[in-house]
């Protein structure tokens, strides 16, 4: 204790639970009192016995006048821990068991030991620090360390003060949930207000009143929408919608759903077409690689003319190497075809219609000698009147090509027998014009004209003249 400073008098008040008990008032010098006098005093023991009820405790408020701590077990099994307390003069000293622990107890206070503030700046051991609080637990529980119902709560706020034994109270219907106050729901309501405006302009003050929210929450929505260019600030506290039409929201949704359904159907149809293309490609590959099919890999004139879709139409067959480019300009008056190839020559064939079942050749009767008589056509007779006649043998002529031979054909396609006669290029000659043979009574002189040799002039006459 500092010199020149009188020791501070300390006054203690012990109150039992329920307002009943005994009061012990002790006034003494802190330096000259016994260290364990208060706990062993009869008045303190009587107060402790009166406060020994379930959930009762005694709290002692002292100044840090001593650095030595002691504890004494009371009749109820409670623990007192704290600095040494001064006691009344003449108090008996009793030895008690010492135990240092952090006390636990119920929230209701049954006993209170208060100390008035010190009269001086400090005590004998002095530091002048804040008063220390110690609580004495006087419950009936035999365990003097921990209580399951009074563990340190892990929650925050109001949940920490609630006892775990008490059931959770259900929320009242009037209490709003977290979703009701969320910014997402508030944004939907704000968009609905914008859609109800005829020109898309909304007053923020009116929106805050209708939605019953603070204006700063409205600003949270408008800042985001303005950042993504969906609204713009028209004037003070007025914003205008810049997105798509909100009045046709239902129609746009139906249109989007219809487009999605159409895209799904087109995707399925495209998938079927891909499968068909793969199947046809595989079949074509098998047909082309087969040796038996390669021998018959051609198209005939009759095959083309048998197609019903090509009836009464002009058919042009094009035989071209791979990578040949075919262009057909879009012309209404005339039809043009442009062919271009860098791999080889291009062959084009015209497939006319056959008017007769047989080859288009004229039929003429032959005589008994096998000669073809002169045709009855006046045009041919007039045009060929200056030519000499001759007889034509059937066996010396080769067959002419028919329209079926316009396409390149294999040997098995060429007809072996021609039912119709051939076309005569010139009118046949009569037998009188040429002697094909001599009779038995004729000689070589009969091949020449007969002349009278006596009438011939002499050679001398030719020389003189």
UniProtKB/Swiss-Prot annotation:
Residues 120-130 have a biased composition (Gly residues). It comes from Homo sapiens. The keyword DNA-binding applies. This is Transcription factor E2F3. Belongs to the E2F/DP family. A motif (DEF box) lies at residues 209-245. Residues 432-449 are annotated as: Retinoblastoma protein binding. Residues 155-245 bind DNA. The lineage of its organism: Eukaryota, Metazoa, Chordata, Craniata, Vertebrata.
């Amino acid at each position: 204790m500092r010199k020149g400073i009188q020791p501070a008098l300390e006054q203690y008040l012990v109150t039992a639970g329920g307002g009943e008990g005994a009061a012990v008032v002790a006034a003494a010098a802190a330096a000259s009192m016994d260290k364990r006098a208060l706990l062993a005093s009869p008045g303190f023991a009587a107060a402790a016995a009166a406060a020994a009820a379930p959930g009762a405790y005694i709290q002692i408020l002292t100044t840090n006048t001593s650095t030595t701590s002691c504890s004494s077990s009371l009749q109820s099994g409670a623990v007192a821990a704290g600095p040494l307390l001064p006691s009344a003069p003449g108090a008996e000293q009793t030895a008690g068991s010492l135990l240092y622990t952090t006390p636990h107890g119920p929230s209701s206070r049954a006993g209170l030991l208060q100390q008035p503030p010190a009269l001086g700046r400090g005590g004998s051991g002095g530091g002048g620090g804040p008063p220390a609080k110690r609580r004495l637990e006087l419950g009936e529980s035999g365990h003097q360390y921990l209580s399951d119902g009074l563990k340190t709560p892990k929650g925050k706020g109001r949940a920490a003060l609630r006892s775990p034994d008490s059931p959770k109270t259900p929320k009242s219907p009037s209490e709003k949930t977290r979703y009701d106050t969320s910014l997402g729901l508030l944004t939907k309501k704000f968009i609905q207000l914008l859609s109800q405006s005829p020109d898309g302009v909304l007053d923020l003050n009116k929106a805050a009143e209708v939605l019953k929210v603070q204006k700063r929450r409205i600003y949270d929505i408008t800042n985001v929408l303005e950042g993504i260019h969906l609204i713009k600030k028209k004037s003070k506290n007025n914003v205008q919608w810049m997105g798509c039409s909100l009045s046709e929201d239902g129609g746009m949704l139906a249109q989007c759903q219809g487009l999605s359904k159409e895209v799904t159907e087109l995707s399925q149809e495209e998938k079927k077409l891909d499968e068909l293309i793969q199947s046809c490609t595989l079949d074509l590959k098998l047909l082309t690689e087969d040796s038996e099919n390669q021998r018959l890999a051609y198209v005939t004139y009759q095959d083309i003319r048998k197609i019903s879709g090509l009836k009464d139409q002009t058919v042009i067959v094009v035989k071209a190497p791979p990578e040949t480019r075919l262009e057909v300009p879009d012309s209404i008056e005339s039809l043009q075809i442009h062919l271009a190839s860098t791999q080889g020559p291009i062959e084009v064939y015209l497939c006319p219609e056959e008017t007769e079942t047989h080859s288009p050749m004229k039929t003429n009767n032959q005589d008994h000698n096998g000669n073809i008589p002169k045709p009855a056509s006046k045009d041919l007779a007039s045009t060929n009147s200056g030519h000499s006649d001759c007889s034509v043998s059937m066996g010396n002529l080769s067959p002419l090509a028919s329209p079926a031979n316009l396409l390149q054909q294999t040997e098995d396609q060429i007809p072996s027998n021609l039912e119709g006669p051939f076309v005569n290029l010139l009118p046949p000659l009569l037998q009188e014009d040429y002697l094909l043979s001599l009779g038995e009574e004729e000689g070589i002189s009969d091949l020449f004209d007969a002349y009278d040799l006596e009438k011939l002039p002499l050679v001398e006459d030719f020389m003189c003249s």
